[in-house]
Amino acid sequence: MKYRDLRDFIAALEARGELTRVTAEVDPYLEITEICDRTLRAGGPALLFENVKGHAMPLLGNLFGTPERVALGMGQDSTAALREVGELLAFLKEPEPPKGFRDAWEKLPIFKQAMSMGPKTLRKAPCQEVILEGDDVDLDRLPIQHCWPGDVAPLVTWSLVVTKGPNKTRQNLGIYRQQKLGKNRLIMRWLSHRGGALDFQEWQSAHPGEPFPVAVALGADPATILGAVTPVPDNLSEYAFAGLLRGSRTELVKCGHADLEVPASSEIVLEGYIYPDDTAPEGPYGDHTGYYNEVETFPVFTVERITHRRDPIYHSTYTGRPPDEPAILGLALNEVFVPILRKQFPEIVDFYLPPEGCSYRMAVVTMKKQYPGHAKRVMMGVWSFLRQFMYTKFVIVLDDDVDARNWEDVIWAITTRMDPARDTVMVENTPIDYLDFASPTAGLGSKMGLDATTKWAGETQREWGTPIVMDEAVKRRVDERWGEYGIATPPPPPRHSPPSDERGHDDV
């Protein structure tokens, strides 16, 4: 199912029993965070808080609190169907030349659809039904969450930040948190390598002393929101990808203050500028690591115009120790990443980002090993192929007889197939998340690769053990006769068996 806007998605979730309207008064200071956190951990519904203390505007939380709702937001019926999204992205990222006329004819609709999904600009838009300027600009109108006791101030989240570099033909769409400083001032926390920060740096070089235009869209349609966090190929804009997910072109409208365009169906839009040398210390804030981050200085965004729909809905979230909403997003996007990685590395069988690893700091990969040293090639590929894994600190590579998503399997393979000195790869002075205070230098640290695959000739001098596997006929007989044994507990599943084509080093 496709959704025109956020309200369409809310209605669909409510019809499925996936959204609860909370009519009791709730406090945006800490209470909403605790409610959303408990609900998310229980796999509960999206929450529409209709009576937020001190505010007339409702707040939407826990929208993407389950992988299934992420899939629905991307227009898919199940998380398994997200593999199809990944296959589409893999094809668009590196399209293969057609093998013949018939192949070219079959691929033509995909290209035509992708090329026809560029956004279209409207003259009037729902997000501009109400316009506030001058003294009417007041961020206190928004029920901005104060998420954790140690947070310095309320924090704007789920904001789609729209920027455009002076030499760019296409806008950048990024999600950056913003600390509330006053009625019209927010701190724009973007790291130096992110698209918005790069646009700002280019603007400062090309237009020194001039204010940098910025727009922030809150409450866009789910396809546009999720398009901003998906590894979209560089030759495809986030808006075009959102159109592919939605099945219709993304509708935009021009801002009143700057040459920027925002999603027309957004609930709320903030327009303004970053003025030269206007910075402020940001934080501390509770973050996805489960810790409060350090205080750092970032540019200040001055809001000069607020537009919104009639009766707008404020979309919000929180971040904390996993599981949180970003961790759930990462879990769902696992399915998108697999086909993209397999396009470059066909030997990869599965790829998993454990949510307890802060969604991206650890990756578990299973592969069909084909030669000595193959596992090390794959781990290097994970670090280098997609920029989303630039901050991944640990990569564990396993044979395909191991379930990457089962820690019992993974730990068994690590402890039985690894020699720490031989099979550990350490890489120093690599890019690391600035929020990772475990690294010795902010933004720079080390990475570890663990080769937990079966070792082949050339990797070991020893005879490699043969895995213990029960006879299949015996397992079937026990399944059939379990009720005769008089054992009260239900039969456990049989032990996982390695594939029949698994080869040890003696088979080389």
Swiss-Prot record:
InterPro entries for this protein: UbiD (IPR002830), UbiD-like_C (IPR049381), UbiD-like_N (IPR049383), UbiD_bacteria (IPR023677), UbiD_Rift_dom (IPR048304)
Annotated function: Catalyzes the decarboxylation of 3-octaprenyl-4-hydroxy benzoate to 2-octaprenylphenol, an intermediate step in ubiquinone biosynthesis.
Binding residues for prenylated FMN: I175, Y176, R177, R189, W190, L191, R194, G195
Pfam family, one: UbiD_N
Subunit-level organization: Homohexamer.
Source species: Chromohalobacter salexigens (strain ATCC BAA-138 / DSM 3043 / CIP 106854 / NCIMB 13768 / 1H11)
GO CC terms in record: cytosol; plasma membrane
Listed cofactors: prenylated FMN; Mn(2+)
Composition bias, Basic and acidic residues: 498-508
Known catalytic reactions: a 4-hydroxy-3-(all-trans-polyprenyl)benzoate + H(+) = a 2-(all-trans-polyprenyl)phenol + CO2
Record's keyword annotation contains Iron-sulfur: no
Designated name of the protein: 3-octaprenyl-4-hydroxybenzoate carboxy-lyase
MF (Gene Ontology): 3-octaprenyl-4-hydroxybenzoate carboxy-lyase activity; metal ion binding
Database matches in PANTHER family: 3-OCTAPRENYL-4-HYDROXYBENZOATE CARBOXY-LYASE-RELATED, FERULIC ACID DECARBOXYLASE 1
Protein keywords: Cell membrane, Decarboxylase, Flavoprotein, FMN, Lyase, Manganese, Membrane, Metal-binding, Ubiquinone biosynthesis
Primary localization: membrane
Biochemical pathway: Cofactor biosynthesis; ubiquinone biosynthesis
Intracellular or extracellular location(s): Cell membrane
Positions of the catalytic residues: D287 (proton donor)
GO terms, biological process: ubiquinone biosynthetic process
Enzyme Commission (EC) number: 4.1.1.98
Class in the EC hierarchy, top level: lyase
Family affiliation: Belongs to the UbiD family.
Membrane topology: Peripheral membrane protein
Gene3D superfamilies referenced in this protein's UniProt entry, alphabetically: Single helix bin (1.20.5.570), UbiD C-terminal domain-like (3.40.1670.10)
Residue ranges of the region described as Disordered: 483-508
Cofactor note: Binds 1 prenylated FMN per subunit.
